[in-house]
């Protein structure tokens, strides 16, 4: 009698490799590894899954879909969780979940498995997303069920012929994609410890960064980055190029004690050189193209959207409604920002746009001034009238 199929989100690491061995007792395991820009050896991971016991192994390059459908909306919404974290891991979980569900449908699987522990946010993100996309699918979390110590897991792996990675003594837990790199555990768990240089992987320290500044022109069309220094490229490629360029200058290091969805505080080290550079540049183009009312209202929704994404609710109607509003605001967000990369900072030093609402003739204090200053008298009287009336009535 054939077994039921289970779709396993497979990373190639110890946890999900052991999960294959554990799951194959009751299921035919289909391993799925997705490339969202982490730079792994995908062919090795594909073969390892089969070697460990999966009946099928999928490797999917979803960098472009991730960039266009998940990263771009977050960029346009200036999505920072708690004003610091650009949602590196939180953004990739919805697209990974979507692909897992698609493969479950293609293969006739009734169950999806992931390698998350019972302590983190990702278990919630995967399971809420999968339930939103297909409530009939069952989800299991082997690592959460085991409750093994690391030593017990290693012993199980050795007993069952699962290769134990050579770098297993690395104290850090790293997650990486196009939008950045997240690192936790080890000495980072004590928030009084300064993060050592070994904890960073894609950025130079300020001390190691070049002593000469570098400039890059980033061009936006309807809020989407489309070119670097006049060279058009796909969004995923543009982000990757900026990760290297801005990372060289030490841009995008973030040390954050954040409030996790599961109720605890966690100290995380993020490296987001491309993300921070693009978020900075995009905001400056918005500043010269959006009317005041949109500029003031949009951040309110941006903060709420950041919380929704972080808290596993990408597929919630509230998220999609806010994203629709954000998209509507981007129609005239066209232009180029000149960004100075130097010693850990990405600073916009010049900007231009064919839809700029900045009128130099209105702003200037020279003889070219076209602002009607005589109109200010009546404006001030009417603007202050409610306050004046309140004082007359209540401050007797």
UniProtKB/Swiss-Prot annotation:
Gene Ontology process terms (BP): argininosuccinate metabolic process; L-arginine biosynthetic process; urea cycle
Principal location listed in the UniProt entry: cytoplasm
Short name of one Pfam family: Arginosuc_syn_C
GO cellular component, one term: cytoplasm
Listed InterPro entries: Arginosuc_syn_C, Arginosuc_syn_N, Arginosuc_synth, Arginosuc_synth_CS, Arginosuc_synth_type_1_subfam, AS_cat/multimer_dom_body, Rossmann-like_a/b/a_fold
Enzyme Commission number(s) from the entry: 6.3.4.5
Catalytic activity line of the entry: L-citrulline + L-aspartate + ATP = 2-(N(omega)-L-arginino)succinate + AMP + diphosphate + H(+)
Location in the cell: Cytoplasm
GO molecular function terms attached to this record: argininosuccinate synthase activity; ATP binding
PANTHER family: ARGININOSUCCINATE SYNTHASE
NCBIfam families with a match to the protein in the record: argG, PRK00509.1
Protein name (Swiss-Prot/TrEMBL): Argininosuccinate synthase
């Amino acid at each position: 009698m054939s077994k039921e199929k289970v779709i396993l989100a497979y990373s190639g690491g110890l946890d999900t490799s052991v999960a294959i061995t554990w799951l194959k007792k009751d299921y035919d395991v289909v391993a799925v590894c997705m490339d969202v820009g982490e730079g792994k050896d995908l062919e090795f991971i594909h073969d390892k899954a089969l070697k460990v016991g999966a009946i099928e192994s999928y490797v999917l390059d979803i960098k472009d879909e991730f960039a266009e459908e998940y990263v771009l909306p977050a960029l346009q919404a200036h999505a920072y969780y708690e004003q610091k974290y650009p949602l590196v891991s939180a953004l990739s979980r919805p697209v990974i979940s979507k692909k897992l569900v698609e493969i479950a449908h293609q293969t006739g699987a009734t169950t999806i498995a992931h390698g998350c522990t019972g302590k983190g946010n990702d278990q919630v993100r995967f399971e809420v997303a999968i339930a939103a996309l297909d409530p009939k699918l069952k989800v299991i979390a082997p690592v959460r069920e085991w409750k093994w110590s690391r030593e017990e897991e290693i012993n199980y792996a050795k007993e069952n012929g699962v290769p134990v990675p050579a770098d297993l003594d690395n104290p850090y837990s790293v997650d990486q994609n196009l939008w950045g790199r997240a690192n936790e555990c080890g000495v980072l768990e004590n928030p009084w410890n300064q993060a050592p240089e070994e904890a960073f992987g894609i950025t130079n320290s300020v001390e190691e960064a070049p002593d000469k500044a570098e400039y890059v022109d980033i061009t936006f069309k309807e809020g989407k980055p489309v070119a670097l220094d006049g060279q058009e490229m796909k969004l995923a490629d543009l982000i990757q190029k900026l990760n290297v360029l801005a990372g060289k200058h030490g841009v995008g290091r973030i040390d954050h004690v954040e409030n996790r969805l599961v109720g605890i505080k966690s100290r995380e080290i993020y490296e987001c050189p491309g993300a921070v550079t693009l978020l900075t540049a995009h905001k400056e183009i918005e500043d010269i193209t959006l009317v005041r009312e949109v500029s003031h209202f949009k951040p309110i929704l941006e903060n709420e959207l950041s919380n929704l994404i972080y808290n596993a609710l990408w597929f919630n109607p509230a998220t999609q409604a806010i994203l629709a509003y954000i998209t509507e605001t981007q129609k005239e967000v066209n232009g180029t920002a000149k960004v100075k990369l130097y010693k850990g900072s990405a600073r916009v030093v010049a900007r231009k746009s064919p839809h700029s609402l900045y009128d130099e003739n209105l702003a200037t204090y020279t003889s070219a001034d076209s602002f009607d200053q005589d109109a200010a008298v009546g404006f001030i009287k009417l603007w202050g009238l409610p306050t004046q009336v309140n004082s007359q009535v209540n401050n007797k």
